[in-house]
């Protein structure tokens, strides 16, 4: 932990940048109170309350993290987005018996590694493991300028730029001529990107996990008002926009309306949203998806009862629970993905 002293009050306030949060590009401002840190987690313009206490040096228990022996092969590879000057490093996971289809996996907002790692959870590694065991291949990769990926401007990149990275990965997969179908699994912002590429007919099918279906300013206003702070309920759209000025990604996201690209998407879609998601509200987004994809064949849209933004079983759904939950991703979600893809 690296800490920077902000003042010398009796409640020492510090700015903490944790190793666990490096991949998120997030910060944490807190005070020491009764032996623990009580503060605010901030990422990509979103601010949420988060309390933290010292943990065992052995780290948290994550029982779903894949452990060998594995019935599949992992291949380290790279592909290039020439326009952005980015070389993306990733892992191709394929069952030893081969696979007919493959999914490229696209992470949520902020710089993230190929496992979409957060608080020692590795959801993309868990998903890739489960899919490979079911004969479904995956390609997951570090975001541009993150992990082993080099080049490209991540700080000022919008979802349009990151969609071009994903498109380069799709082109690489098709060039391998190993798979009959190439799909895209996107989480959160990755779901947004999935529909961008779906509208361009770049993929054969889409799995959207907590992907937004409404304009970005509505999403951020919901997040802010449901952050748990007593003052948050009174936040207005005007205040939010003024607060976010200067953050290129947030300004772009607030103005972006995904409905046009969703309506243009004609490939099969599996869209899952957790009912306790405090970042992308299920009811609001599911309603829009059902309307826009009503005529889309082989599409399944589902609210996952009791699950948060990471698709963990939870109490409140707020991000301050993520660390303490041992489950990385609900088993029923993994089963839904495998079952749906295998029926295509």
What is the role of each PLM region?
Residues 99-109:
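Short beta-strand element of the alpha/beta-hydrolase
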């Amino acid at each position: 932990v690296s800490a920077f002293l902000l003042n010398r009050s009796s409640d020492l306030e510090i700015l903490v940048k944790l190793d666990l949060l490096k991949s998120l590009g997030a910060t944490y401002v807190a005070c020491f109170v009764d032996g623990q840190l009580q503060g605010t987690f901030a990422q990509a313009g979103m601010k949420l309350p988060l309390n933290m206490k010292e943990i065992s040096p052995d780290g948290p228990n994550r029982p779903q993290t894949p452990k060998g022996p594995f019935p599949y092969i992992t291949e380290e590879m790279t592909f290039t987005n020439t326009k952005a000057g980015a070389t993306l490093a990733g892992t191709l996971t394929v069952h030893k018996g081969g696979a007919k289809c493959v999914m490229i996996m696209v992470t949520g907002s902020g710089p993230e590694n190929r496992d979409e790692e957060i608080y020692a959870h590795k959801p993309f590694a868990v998903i890739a493991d489960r899919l490979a065991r079911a004969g479904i291949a995956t390609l997951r990769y570090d975001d541009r300028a993150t992990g082993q990926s080099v080049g490209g401007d991540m700080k000022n990149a919008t979802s349009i730029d990151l969609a071009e990275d994903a498109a380069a990965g799709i082109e690489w997969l098709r060039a391998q001529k190993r798979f009959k179908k190439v799909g895209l699994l996107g989480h959160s912002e990755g779901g947004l990107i999935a529909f961008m590429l779906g509208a361009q007919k770049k993929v054969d099918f889409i799995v959207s996990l907590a992907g937004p279906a409404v304009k970005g300013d509505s999403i951020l206003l919901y997040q802010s008002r449901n952050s748990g702070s007593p003052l948050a309920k009174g936040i207005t759209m005007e205040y939010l926009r003024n607060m976010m000025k200067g953050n290129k990604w947030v300004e772009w996201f607030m103005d972006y309306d995904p409905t046009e690209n969703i309506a243009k998407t004609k490939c099969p879609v599996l869209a899952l949203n957790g009912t306790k998601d405090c970042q992308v509200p299920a009811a609001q987004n599911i309603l829009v998806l059902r309307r826009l994809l009503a005529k889309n064949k082989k599409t399944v849209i589902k609210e996952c009862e009791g699950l948060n933004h990471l698709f963990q079983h939870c109490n409140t759904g707020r991000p301050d629970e993520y660390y303490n939950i041992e489950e990385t991703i609900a088993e029923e979600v993994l089963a839904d993905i495998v079952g749906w893809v295998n029926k295509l």
